Amino acid sequence: MELGQLLPALLMAAWLLPLASFVVIVLLGPKLGKHGVGASYIATAAIVCSFILSAIGFIGWCGTFGAVGAAAHESGHAPIVAGHEAQAAEHQAESTGHAEHVPKLTPPKSFSGVWYTLGSFGKLRVTISYYIDSLTVAMFCMVTLIASCIHFYAIGYMHDELHDVVDHQVVLSDGQHLHRHGRFHRFFQYLSLFCFSMLGIVIAGNVAMVFVFWELVGICSYFLIGFYIERKSASNAANKAFIVNRVGDFGMIIGMMALWASLGTFSFGDLSDADGKVVERGIFSQVRDPANNYALLTPPGMVRAAASDHVASIVRDHEGAGHKPIDAEMEIQSELSGWRNQGYGYWLLVIAGVGIFCGCVGKSAQFPLHVWLPDAMEGPTPVSALVHSATMVAAGVYLTGRFYPVFAPEVLLVVAYAGAITLVLAATIAVVATDIKRVLAYSTVSQLGYMMLALGVGGWVAGMFHLITHAFFKSLLFMCSGSVIHATHTNEMPMMGGLRHKMPWTAYTMLVGCLAIIGAGIPFLIGFSGYYSKDAIIAQALSFWHHNPTHGAVFFFAAAGGASLTAFYMFRLWYLTFAGVPRDHHVYEHAHESPKVMYMPLVVLAVFALAIGWSFPGVIGVADWLEQ
């Protein structure tokens, strides 16, 4: 079987397994073992199998296409995937001002197709389709691996939910604490649906399908952030996350409608029939036409929509003269180039890009819609680890990267400024926070700003590379913080201190995470994963400054200053928690290392946080992979 047939089948199975787990747990629930403990085994087995299938797809892709060139082109700039198999979109010099024009581009590989057509409404086909390239495969491996570790971790962390629970944070009107039944099976039920939704976004082949799973991710986050629904803080946090994201989604709908009304399709790549003939041109190939060497070009549909008065005038003139409709169409086609040169339709391209990015601003907690993410820590720590690393917040950055070929230079400038403001603002707040999970929450907001900044200044590879490295070390950091909270029953770092003696596994795996997020390394020799991805971002910002002095200085100093703040607040967190002497002896005396089912996933993630950025001669690295 060829890779073009095998890969969609593998990834479809990997995508649907968490859905099957969700359905089984919904139907059987508490009947799955004693107190529903079997729900965790089913959910964990499903996501582990998804990872295995994704890894097989990864190996198949490597075996077929191999690696390319030097990591990240030394600047994090890379071709942008667009189109079906032999089509791609390249971020050109005119869109960023710093990429050298390539006379003839060699497009990266991608596969697109339709699994099922739900219905046709005029020219609009609503389909369940796929779009698979190197980014899709990398995201599948990352999401399923991290989710697998979190599932194992959650088996230990959520064990209290196997029995009746006394919630000491909820006081009833009679002064008693809340007593309720455990919700162990329900937690894994939501977790499975969450993973299914995120994988649906990644594999989706059209904007409509993305939007469905985009909203499903939002619903799952509402359920999981508000898991302790009786707590007012959790209820408010869930509502806040849901409502703030709807603000961004309103803009996303506007962007979708601009694309559909002018281009007549929701598909990313071109769709072909059984004979290989293109039956529907996708968004990417219309915006970055292969005939135009994949340079950004206002599509004919947008030009016609913007010049509708001229089009109507031509049609009326030909009808009045008794000409055939084809004569009017030929004149319209001959006028398109002139209208495009006059700027017709370009504003539609900008509106579509800004609209799509508005949805990404909400999901990835960018300024000014960043306010929901720090409160998302009200959910159980495994939820925080998943939300802040591989699923919800990653979706916004992923979609920005996926739509990259569509973004005009003005849109990329908006992306860069949003990222720069977000990364500095969140980092300054993290410096003074005392709640261990809140520090990590603001750290997530700041790192997402880094990714958006990279994308805005033309560093597609750098931004996507940091998305993947960040997912590993941030999930590790959140799970370590959960291990601390599980042992000490407090989130406040001033009440901790000296815990490395009681929790060595947690302490030193968290140290690895801290070193990874600050980008520690020995220059020109070796470093933690963040060393490579952050270096690519800062190098890209410097290159942008060199070619765009008007805006570039802001982005470079934001990236460099944010890196310094990150180093400060992360080591402040580690020292306050694990170093020094105990500041609250009651907390210290009751502290203990987490069970093996909780700290072994930390070790696995620590290895990836250390080495996911490495690249060896003859072995494909993540940056090389994304270059495809």
Task: Give the ranges of each region predicted by the language model.
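Short, strongly hydrophobic alpha-helical membrane anchors
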Residues: 1-10
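N-terminal signal-anchor/start-transfer transmembrane helix
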Residues: 15-30, 361, 365
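Membrane-interface helix-loop junction between the first two transmembrane segments
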Residues: 24-41, 158
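Interfacial/capping segments of alpha-helical transmembrane domains
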Residues: 58-114, 269-280, 526-527, 531, ...
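Hydrophobic alpha-helical transmembrane segments in multi-pass integral membrane proteins
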Residues: 83-194, 311-312
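Hydrophobic transmembrane alpha-helices and their helix-loop junctions in integral membrane proteins
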Residues: 149-166, 170-210, 219-594, 608, ...
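Short phosphate-coordinating micro-motif centered on Lys-Gly-acidic
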Residues: 215
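Hard-cation-handling environments
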Residues: 591-628
